[in-house]
């Protein structure tokens, strides 16, 4: 993996995604805790807290694109491609990089312990709202 003199490009730990049975009920719970709903789709929602830098994705029962995971966020799209290529060259099984409908781009992989994680480019200003 990357050494101290070889930065990975990871900006921060950005969001956690959890599976929920009832998206609307979960949104109500988390907005009551002070989170802001910024993306709402039929099968998933995204909420932010604070200055919009920390997020929670609520994955409904019909959401099939990904399962529960945590995500490292990158400041630029190139960083995602660089880490994707580096991990692949090291023999790590990584998914393809996808451009998403919310302006982000990402890929998924498992760490050596079997935990799912996402490497995500987040556009300047954060994930745009569709609400």
Predicted regions span which residues?
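Vicinal oxygen chelate
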Residues: 2-9, 13-21, 62-131
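Long, continuous compositionally biased terminal/linker segments
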Residues: 6, 55-60
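Acetyl-CoA-dependent GNAT
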Residues: 41, 59-61, 121-125
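Short hydrophobic/aromatic beta-strand element in the GNAT-like acyltransferase core
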Residues: 46, 55, 71, 94, ...
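Short low-complexity, flexible loop/linker segments enriched in glycine and/or proline
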Residues: 53-56, 110-112
């Amino acid at each position: 993996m990357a050494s101290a003199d070889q930065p990975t490009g990871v900006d921060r730990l950005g969001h956690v995604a959890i599976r929920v049975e009832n998206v609307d009920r979960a949104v109500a719970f988390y907005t009551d805790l002070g989170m802001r709903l910024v993306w709402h789709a039929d099968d998933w929602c995204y909420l932010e807290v604070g200055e919009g830098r920390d997020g929670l994705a609520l994955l409904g029962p019909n959401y099939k694109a990904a399962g529960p995971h945590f995500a490292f966020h990158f400041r630029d799209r190139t960083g995602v491609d660089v880490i994707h290529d580096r991990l692949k060259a090291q023999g790590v099984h990584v998914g393809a990089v996808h451009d998403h409908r919310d302006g982000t781009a990402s890929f998924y992989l498992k760490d050596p312990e079997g935990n799912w994680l996402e490497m995500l480019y987040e556009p300047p200003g954060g994930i745009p709202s569709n609400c």
